[in-house]
Amino acid sequence: MEKLLIEGGRALNGTIRVSGAKNSAVALIPTTILADTPVTIGGVPNISDVKMLGDLLEEIGGKVTYGQEEEMVVDPSNMVAMPLPNGKVKKLRASYYLMGAMLGRFKKAVIGLPGGCHLGPRPIDQHIKGFEALGAHVTNEQGAIYLRADELRGARIYLDVVSVGATINIMLAAVRAKGRTVIENAAKEPEIIDVATLLTSMGARIKGAGTDVIRIDGVDSLHGCHHTIIPDRIEAGTYMILGAASGGEVTVDNVIPQHLESVTAKLREAGVQVETNDDQITVNGNRKLKVVDIKTLVYPGFPTDLQQPFTTLLTKAHGTGVVTDTIYGARFKHIDELRRMNAQIKVEGRSAIVTGPVLLQGAKVKASDLRAGAALVIAGLMADGITEVTGLEHIDRGYENIVDKLKGLGANIWREQMTKQEIEEMKNA
């Protein structure tokens, strides 16, 4: 196991390139199951979640190859509806997309209940409601979801809560169903449009992706195609916040600026200079920071995935700011770690109250989930002294080559192997 060491206090300057979107990739890869011929996906990020999904597709008979320029080619022609009740499937939150894709192609699936980041209750009841409306019989047996259907028929499905995962999963199950499916109160995230674009290129008939009503007319079969993933707006937002935190000038390259309007607006409100053009955003962090309040909302609101990194930034602002997470109320595990670094933060219900400015101090901290990891890396870069971050496996799930990318901006950051004693101490902590 490795740990990350960061020497803080340096202003970061330069250009950092964003990879393909993790939250798209983990849905696009299972989508390939629905095709009869090979699918090529370009811009695939080199992260552990992607590798694990590729391995899962091979477990069910797919052939997965990695080509030039971050390309992944999936040949789904020999796939079978093999049950996946245990193993890798349980380590990966996004493995639930295998349910919709396998149900759509094979009319049956057995998928172990997924893991990923532990952010409190993240139920899949809306997914199941959608599958049942399409005609599937769904049971939960010994920690695995069993899905079976004689046939899938289009239905009108109203989501009780706006859910990206449920919206995508129902789309996957519905594209080869008989008749029309209408998803109402659908999520509008860019990643949903990305999945719909791939499905349409494969021959699906989908209208309304990116709005709150999606209409799908089922087709008998889908074919292979070539698709390029959208840039990762969460990775881009992380580096925008990092630029503001470090006091230098950082240009974030390969972005779609309209996907980041909520983040841009909040940074500007905090007094950060932000300039956007077609596919780049430049953040200048050398001004005094004003305090702002953040409230996470579904897209196009402020993303829950950037709440933790922004909380770190607020330790540098003058005054008291409130960060409220309306999406995942349990997403505050990074706060205790930031407190170890001298941050003045208290948690009340779904809100973190941040008082600044304080100079963060280097410390030994542990990432408990992916975006907490990003928050702690930013904290380490802001802090006085050396910060040691463990729990790197969480960061590697969602950030491609983060060490090399940050070194390119002038950060002093490196990985080291942990000793046996350190690993034991971490497990017992």
From Swiss-Prot:
The modification 2-(S-cysteinyl)pyruvic acid O-phosphothioketal is found at residue 117. InterPro entries: Enolpyruvate_Tfrase_dom, Enolpyruvate_Tfrase_sf, MurA_subfamily, RNA3'P_cycl/enolpyr_Trfase_a/b, UDP_GlcNAc_COvinyl_MurA. Pathway: Cell wall biogenesis; peptidoglycan biosynthesis. Belongs to the EPSP synthase family. MurA subfamily. The keyword Coiled coil does not apply. UDP-N-acetyl-alpha-D-glucosamine binds at residues 93, 122-126, 305, 327. GO terms for cellular component: cytoplasm. One of its GO terms (biological process) is cell division. One of its GO terms (molecular function) is UDP-N-acetylglucosamine 1-carboxyvinyltransferase activity. CDD domains: UdpNAET. It is found in: Cytoplasm. Its EC number is 2.5.1.7. Gene3D superfamilies: Enolpyruvate transferase domain. NCBIfam families: murA (TIGR01072), PRK09369.1 (NF006873), PRK12830.1 (NF009470). Its main location: cytoplasm. Keywords: Cell cycle, Cell division, Cell shape, Cell wall biogenesis/degradation, Cytoplasm, Peptidoglycan synthesis, Pyruvate, Transferase. This is UDP-N-acetylglucosamine 1-carboxyvinyltransferase 2. Phosphoenolpyruvate binds at residues 22-23. The active site is at 117 (proton donor). It catalyses: phosphoenolpyruvate + UDP-N-acetyl-alpha-D-glucosamine = UDP-N-acetyl-3-O-(1-carboxyvinyl)-alpha-D-glucosamine + phosphate.
